[in-house]
């Protein structure tokens, strides 16, 4: 019977707070114009403040954004890194093939963040992110002599471009500090540089006998029809370059990220100059690799296309096989129809694009950036090209039929080549989760301590307040840094570390709320309804938590809102200093930690601006909402100001 009465009382209190009292409570119904509950009045007053409403919308939108947006990023990984995409600015120009080239394509090539193209009329075009880091070079600044020449071949490396004119002249521009092109005395003295061949510098190359021009990471190779090879550039990037100098008999050559690779006339292995490297093959990414000679069974390798750490080989029967390592979740090699076979293969950093004798185009391999999403309707292609994360299909007239893959990055990339937008979204989720859990912990402790201390008073109040003062006397930031440093020496999982950080924030930030609740309870316990409850014999715990606490809930809500913003800033401060959530797991704080040097602040502004903006906007809006709640819930505080 008593439980039913309690339920009715609590439900009645909630009903009156949010929906107002019954008209039957009035002595004269005809004199009642409108009865508004306290809750409705608070809501009405809040929505009259346009700035507060805007701030609340921003906070809600931010919450929904950081918790829902990751659901649409199934390929996101905290540990993702990509050397060829480091420090790229915001933009979507990587697939922006110039309109003049799109109607008359002869060559398209790319190794990193920019692409180079040559038209059938001999004009050269460059697009994408063309500025080379902080070097000051911009490959879009095409030398005048190249613009005046009739270009027949071109290839792009990570930071340079090599082009060949119809007269055999070899042109190079971009970064040349590690022997990418040109001849300098300092190159000859550097053991880590293989200098541009003197005969090519003086006499050029016989264009009619050039079979392939290809560039890698700060290196270049030219394959001649007679099987000889010219190779030069950064030997530190490709330690096996010496194995290709003065060696002939090659039918194809290319660069992975770490090795020069080639196919010799025998066609029974991938040549690297190192025994045991790339000596296993498989038909698909899902299969287990076996020894190369066992896989070939007399078939011959006639061509290759190299990605970052893998190779696709074309066999003389029109089939393909894979060598090297592939990312998890890679797309499988397509199953061709009877009579269909591959006639050309091009490679990106992690994906491959193949053209069949029936004009069909397929892509497979790594698909983290949608490199394998071939548009429908490409059935009459005669030539394909691939960039680092892009692919192109061209018809017999040189007209671009389709392009697919990475367009660019909304917020640019960081120093590891990761998408800043995706890290901001996932970092916001982590920051808000840590802040919310910390506030819940501090609220539970603060409300219990404050309510007990304020209601019972005496020795209970004395003991609890001394404990509170003890916690408040702990210097928060040094203590948190010390605990984080201790944890870094312990074998803790990242999730456990994050949980401990939440607990640290919660356990050290409840003292202010406890004092506030204590003061409100001390004031409220002298009211008549409390005295009446005591006279009726209601238990002290029930009076404290069921009668007094609901009357101070408005102050608690305001404090929780403001404390949440404080916890966001505190977590971000710890992470910024390197003592919070650790890289590679992102938070807004540790993303700012990666942008704390002058080079990044000046040259790579997007790496700190976006996380800083999200953090600032969120905390400011939360504070605006909290201040407005305080004003509408406590009219006296507003009047005092």
Regions found by a protein language model. Give the residues of each.
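Transmembrane alpha-helices
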Residues: 429-445, 541-573, 622
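Glycine-rich helix-loop "coupling/hinge" segments at transmembrane-helix boundaries
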Residues: 485-487, 562, 570-610, 614, ...
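Transmembrane alpha-helix signature in integral membrane proteins
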Residues: 54-58, 111-114, 119-122, 421-455, ...
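Short cytosolic juxtamembrane segments of multi-pass membrane proteins
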Residues: 530, 624-641
């Amino acid at each position: 019977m008593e439980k039913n009465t309690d339920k009715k009382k609590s439900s009645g209190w909630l009903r009156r707070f949010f929906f107002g009292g019954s008209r039957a409570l009035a002595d004269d119904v005809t004199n009642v114009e409108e009865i508004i509950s306290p809750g409705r009045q608070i809501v009405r007053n809040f929505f009259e403040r346009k700035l507060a409403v805007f701030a609340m919308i921003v906070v809600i939108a931010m919450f929904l954004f950081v918790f829902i947006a990751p659901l649409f990023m199934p390929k996101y990984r905290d540990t993702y890194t990509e050397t060829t995409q480091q420090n790229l600015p915001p933009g979507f120009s990587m697939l922006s093939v110039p309109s003049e080239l799109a109607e008359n394509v002869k060559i398209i090539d790319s190794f990193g963040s920019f692409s180079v193209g040559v038209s059938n009329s001999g004009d050269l075009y460059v697009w994408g992110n063309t500025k080379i880091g902080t070097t000051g070079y911009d490959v879009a600044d095409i030398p005048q002599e190249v613009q005046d020449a009739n270009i027949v071949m071109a290839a792009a490396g990570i930071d340079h471009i090599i082009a060949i004119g119809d007269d055999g002249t070899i042109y190079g521009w971009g970064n040349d500090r590690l022997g990418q092109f040109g001849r300098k005395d300092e190159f000859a003295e550097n053991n880590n540089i293989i200098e541009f061949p003197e005969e090519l510098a003086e006499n050029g190359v016989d264009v009619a006998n050039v079979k392939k021009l290809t560039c890698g990471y700060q290196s270049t190779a030219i394959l001649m029809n007679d099987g000889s090879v010219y190779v030069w550039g950064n030997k530190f990037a490709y330690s096996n370059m010496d194995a290709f100098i003065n060696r002939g008999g090659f039918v194809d050559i290319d660069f992975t990220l770490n090795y020069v690779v080639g196919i010799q006339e025998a066609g029974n292995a991938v040549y690297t100059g190192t025994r045991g490297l790339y000596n296993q093959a498989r038909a698909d990414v899902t299969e287990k690799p076996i020894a190369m000679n066992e896989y070939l069974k007399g078939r011959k390798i006639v061509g290759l296309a190299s990605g970052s750490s893998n190779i696709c080989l074309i066999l003389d029967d029109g089939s393909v096989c894979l060598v090297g390592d592939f990312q998890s979740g890679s797309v499988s090699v397509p199953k061709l129809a009877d009579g269909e076979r591959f006639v050309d293969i091009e490679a990106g950093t992690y994906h491959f694009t193949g053209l069949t004798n029936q004009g069909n185009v397929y892509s497979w391999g790594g698909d983290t950036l949608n490199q394998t999403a071939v548009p429908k309707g490409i059935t009459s292609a005669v030539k394909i090209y691939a960039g680092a994360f892009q692919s192109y299909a061209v018809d017999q007239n040189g007209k671009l039929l389709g392009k697919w893959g990475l367009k660019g990055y909304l917020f640019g990339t960081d120093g590891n080549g990761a998408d800043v937008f995706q890290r901001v979204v996932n970092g916001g989720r982590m920051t808000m989760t840590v802040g919310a859990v910390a506030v819940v912990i501090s609220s539970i402790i603060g409300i219990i301590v404050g309510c007990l201390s304020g209601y019972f008073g005496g020795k209970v109040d004395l003991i609890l307040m001394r404990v509170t003062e003890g916690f408040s006397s702990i210097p928060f930031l040094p203590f948190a840094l010390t605990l984080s440093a201790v944890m870094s020496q312990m074998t803790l999982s990242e999730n456990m570390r994050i949980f401990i950080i939440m607990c640290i924030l919660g356990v050290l930030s409840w003292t202010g709320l406890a004092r506030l609740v204590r003061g409100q309870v001390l004031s409220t316990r002298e009211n008549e309804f409390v005295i009446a409850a005591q006279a009726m014999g209601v238990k002290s715990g029930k009076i404290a938590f069921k009668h007094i606490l609901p009357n101070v809930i408005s102050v608690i809500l305001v404090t929780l809102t403001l404390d949440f913003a404080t916890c966001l800033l505190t977590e971000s401060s710890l992470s910024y200093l390197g003592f919070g959530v650790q890289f590679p797991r992102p938070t807004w704080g540790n993303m700012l930690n990666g942008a704390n040097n002058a080079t990044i602040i000046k040259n790579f502004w997007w790496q700190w601006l976006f996380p800083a903006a999200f953090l600032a906007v969120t905390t400011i809006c939360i504070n605006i909402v909290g201040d407005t709640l305080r004003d509408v819930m406590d009219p006296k505080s507003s009047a005092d100001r």
